[in-house]
Amino acid sequence: MALVEDNNAVAVSFSEEQEALVLKSWAILKKDSANIALRFFLKIFEVAPSASQMFSFLRNSDVPLEKNPKLKTHAMSVFVMTCEAAAQLRKAGKVTVRDTTLKRLGATHLKYGVGDAHFEVVKFALLDTIKEEVPADMWSPAMKSAWSEAYDHLVAAIKQEMKPAE
């Protein structure tokens, strides 16, 4: 992950090739983003079943995960934000989620005790989902690397906001 310091802002170096790979795959993914987003979250819970307990709307719910409307909405929001942030990374030179959103994400992730292991599970699920959803001849080590780096930048931006209230 290449970072370039500029005053107090941290600029991201994301290559033209990486951007092209992310944009090409995102163009395919966003056509069915609601269903893909749900599969992404179901994969998270498959890898880490206890993760579902981190979501208040899933605790004590009798609704199957794949039919839970709140999970569908949340999954869509997370998936689209992650993919859009990745798609804008090179052009913007930084993660382009609004500051208020980053602050809220940081506070929420801190409140629920989200740690590095959780972010790694989500990263695994994201990369695996993208691999499954793009045409087989499109997926490559370079595409995996591009998405991985983009995700790492988003997580770094969220972690910067994961500070206890003073």
From Swiss-Prot:
Localisation: Cytoplasm; Nucleus
Cofactor: heme b
Residues making up the signal peptide according to the UniProt record: none
Segments crossing the lipid bilayer: none
Protein name per UniProt: Anaerobic nitrite reductase NSHB1
Annotated consequence of substituting E120V: Prevents subunit association, but has little effect on ligand binding
PANTHER family membership: LEGHEMOGLOBIN-RELATED (PTHR22924), NON-SYMBIOTIC HEMOGLOBIN 3 (PTHR22924:SF98)
Catalytic reactions of this protein: Fe(III)-heme b-[protein] + nitric oxide + H2O = Fe(II)-heme b-[protein] + nitrite + 2 H(+)
Protein family: Belongs to the plant globin family.
InterPro entries: Globin (IPR000971), Globin-like_sf (IPR009050), Globin/Proto (IPR012292), Leghaemoglobin-like (IPR001032), Leghaemoglobin_Fe_BS (IPR019824)
Tissues/organs with expression: Expressed in coleoptiles, embryos, leaves, seminal roots and roots.
UniProt gene name: NSHB1
Record annotation: effect of changing S50A: Prevents subunit association, but has little effect on ligand binding
Function: Phytoglobin that reduces nitrite to nitric oxide under anoxic conditions (e.g. during flooding or in waterlogged soil). May not function as an oxygen storage or transport protein. Has an unusually high affinity for O(2) through a hexacoordinate heme iron because of a very low dissociation constant.
Binding site for heme b: S56, K70, H74, R104, T108, H109
GO terms, biological process: response to nitrate; response to nitric oxide; response to nitrite
Primary location: cytoplasm
Domain Globin: 13-163
Keywords: Cytoplasm, Heme, Iron, Metal-binding, Nucleus, Oxidoreductase
CDD domains tied to this protein: class1_nsHb-like
Any GO MF annotation of the entry: oxygen binding
